[in-house]
Amino acid sequence: LFIDRNILSSLLQFCKEGHIQSAEAKRIGVLMTWSRLCGIDISAGLAVRERASQRHSQSSALLELQKFFDVFDQYPLQMWFQVATGRLNKIPQITFSGKVAYGISVDYSDPGDHYEMAVASLLHLVWLYRNNDAAPLEKIRDFYLWLYDNLLISEYLLVYAAMLFTNQSKIKAPKHANSNSLKAIISGCENQAWDISYLTNWSTLYSEPERYDKEFLFATNDNLLK
């Protein structure tokens, strides 16, 4: 089960401070209880990579990854069950080991190809989005052909583009898409690219079930991703 940055941040904050907002605490409790009871491993790798690549720091990634491991070492299942059912809204504050994870071969300071492709795609999407002379169908076709000619076809990017260009409810362009500042536009695309790359990374695993002897799931608190 892959988790996104929002969930990882909430989990670590909950354990560090001993409390968070009640509804969020219950969500964390349900996730931890359900995964443990079902024997499902939780992976924070993508969430750790998001923050570490922004900081260009492998050391911070290994430290955060160890904090994530510490959570599983120090809290019992029964406690998470009580949190999930609302019988417990505060937990003992964790004592993180202060160590860094070892035996890790992944370079978390590198955002990866999926992220970089998403940034490039979203920049082109914003260029099309700002073109008021083109019809929605033209924009969708142009975006598809651009992906085909330059990168890889991504179902998630295509669905997002189609929903954006046809003004579907609650679907928003990347932040600062209408800004006159190129720096702001790039920043907005970089932020949105992480959402897309979570899905595309996940899709490379679940789309070929015959290659793996396990199922891959993804959990998020992000409304757009849902």
Can you say where each PLM-predicted feature lies in the sequence?
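Active-site-proximal, substrate-binding regions of enzyme catalytic domains
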Residues: 1-216, 226
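Long, internal scaffold/assembly segments composed of regular secondary structure
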Residues: 222-224
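Acidic beta-strand-to-loop metal/phosphate-binding motif
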Residues: 218-220
